[in-house]
């Protein structure tokens, strides 16, 4: 009644309209606040989902590490290198998560998609054992940096390097990890990682082809290791037969399949080399030297393979730094050959010949004698390598570079493990989180994940 008496109907309507506008603004404000917080909760929900997926990926990696340990226990016996067809390596389901083992194909130099499997550490050069003569022939390395590596690991400084500006002193002790190379004087990303910044063995679209070669130029991280160690005894702990000190009975027992006459001929030849009637005897330098000698005495490759895992030329408990010729990369082989004073052209030709032979004759790689079959008894490369103990066909350390994702391809994680089976059961020597390097599974894996999650 007061509204009607004081202002009339028009004044009352104006008052009611003002209230309506205020109410509308209040409603708009409340709705905006509600939408804002709802949007914030959507982001929080996504973040929580990603965290959950990440936890699932972490657990998938833990499960994958156990799986790899079991695979090594079953297949990496007596120095054998497990084949990626013997166990699952790609998109292996662990609940709603999946994992991959990012490997390297030893017979393919220019992969366009990641190769899945274990990485044989025995296929690499050991930073603590290989000389400057070998290191300097690796691509993307300078002779100065090769000297710096020797200086870092040596008990006494080999060269005079000023680490003052870097804020630390040289170690003057063996390398404990490959990543320790980052601390060596003169190290650069280009030298250590090459063009493979995410270290998956593939030139990805996000990585720059610096020299426009169309191929990946890998760095030292892919070519060196610190873990290789090969037992010089049988798996049950019994000793191998040292051919440099073996008796007639031991040699004849090893080569039983040759027959009595051939056994005697071989023993006579071995004894004449070790203990000639005149002059100084010559010990066998390594397994390749002994294999070459046996081949020249008419022993077949199969005949030598039957005894290869039972003989040695050393009294050391372990061999350190020998390279597995069955899995070594082309660049590593070339560096090894040139380090043994083989000329570059011959080294490159021999390396390619060995890789081709490996691809065409995968069942003939049981002993070191296959190198002689591939290159020939009179090869200058074989002769040079026989002067030392550089090569083997056995491996006991393997890297498992495990990447995993949770449901819908979320929560990407990546961890690298180094496994050692030289003392029997597999054990983990080293663990490194590589998630910071970004996606390493290639475009095809991403497309497959997206396709499956949108079906």
List each model region and its residues.
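Compositionally biased linear targeting/interaction segments
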Residues: 2-7, 16-455
């Amino acid at each position: 009644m007061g509204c009607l008496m004081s202002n009339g109907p028009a004044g009352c309507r104006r008052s009611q309209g003002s209230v309506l506008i205020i109410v509308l603004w209040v409603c708009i404000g409340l709705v905006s606040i509600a939408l804002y917080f709802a949007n914030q909760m959507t982001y929080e929900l996504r973040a929580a989902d990603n965290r959950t997926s990440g936890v699932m990926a972490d657990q998938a990696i833990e499960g994958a590490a156990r799986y790899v340990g079991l695979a090594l226990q079953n297949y990496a016996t007596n120095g054998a290198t497990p084949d990626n067809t013997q166990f699952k390596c790609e998109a292996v389901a662990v609940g709603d998560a999946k994992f991959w083992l990012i490997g390297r194909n030893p017979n393919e130099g220019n992969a366009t998609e990641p190769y899945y499997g274990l990485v044989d550490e025995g296929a690499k050069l050991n930073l603590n054992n290989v000389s400057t003569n070998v290191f300097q022939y690796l691509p993307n390395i300078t002779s100065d940096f090769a000297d710096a590596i020797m200086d870092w690991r040596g008990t006494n400084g080999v060269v005079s390097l000023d680490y003052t500006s870097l804020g630390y002193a040289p170690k003057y002790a063996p390398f404990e990890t490959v990543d320790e190379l980052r601390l060596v004087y003169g190290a650069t990303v280009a030298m250590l990682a090459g063009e493979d910044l995410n270290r998956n063995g593939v030139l990805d679209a996000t990585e720059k082809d610096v020299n426009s070669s169309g191929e990946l130029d890998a760095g030292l991280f892919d070519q060196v290791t610190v873990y290789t160690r090969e037992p010089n005894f049988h798996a049950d702990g019994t000793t191998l037969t040292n051919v440099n000190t073996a008796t007639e009975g031991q040699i004849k027992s090893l080569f039983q399949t040759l027959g009595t006459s051939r056994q005697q001929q071989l023993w006579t030849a071995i004894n004449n080399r070790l203990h000639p009637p005149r002059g100084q005897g010559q010990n066998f330098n390594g397994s390749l030297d002994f294999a070459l000698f046996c081949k020249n005495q008419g022993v077949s490759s199969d005949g030598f393979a039957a005894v290869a895992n039972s003989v040695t030329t050393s009294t050391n408990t372990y061999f350190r730094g020998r390279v597995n010729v069955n899995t070594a990369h082309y660049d590593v082989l070339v560096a090894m050959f040139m380090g043994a004073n083989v000329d570059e052209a011959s080294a490159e030709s021999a390396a390619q010949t060995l890789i081709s032979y490996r691809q065409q004759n995968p069942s003939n790689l049981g002993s070191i004698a296959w190198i002689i079959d591939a290159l020939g008894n009179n090869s200058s490369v074989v002769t040079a390598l026989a002067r030392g103990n550089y090569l083997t066909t056995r491996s006991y350390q393997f890297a498992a570079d495990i990447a995993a994702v949770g449901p819908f391809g979320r929560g990407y994680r990546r961890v690298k493990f180094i496994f050692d089976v030289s003392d029997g059961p597999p054990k983990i020597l080293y663990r490194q989180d590589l998630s910071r390097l970004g996606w390493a599974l290639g475009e095809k894996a991403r497309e497959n994940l997206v396709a499956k999650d949108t079906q």
